[in-house]
Amino acid sequence: MSTSTSLMPLRIVVDSREQNPFPFAGLPVVVSVGTLEAGDYSLAGFERKVAVERKELGDLIGCLSVERERFERELARLRGYDCAAVVVEAPVAD
């Protein structure tokens, strides 16, 4: 019997409405596409507990101004999750 344990790859679910999904290229993950109730990404088996909303900097600016009501609804949906995050994707200089 082997004493080494091999880790299963992380299984990420990408929401089917995500227009430009993160590629996860070269990372030890398995990606599947599905419809999530909240967020753009989750973990397989934890779709109702874990949600990640991904925003590019330009999207975030829109969400804080002209699309604020929609963003507030997104945040309200995330409140019901055990683990939720909004990730802003931008260069460090920005």
For the regions a protein language model found, what residue spans apply to each?
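Extended, alpha-helix-rich binding/interface surfaces that flank or overlap catalytic cores
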Residues: 1-3, 19, 30-94
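Short, charged N-terminal beta->alpha structural module
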Residues: 4-29
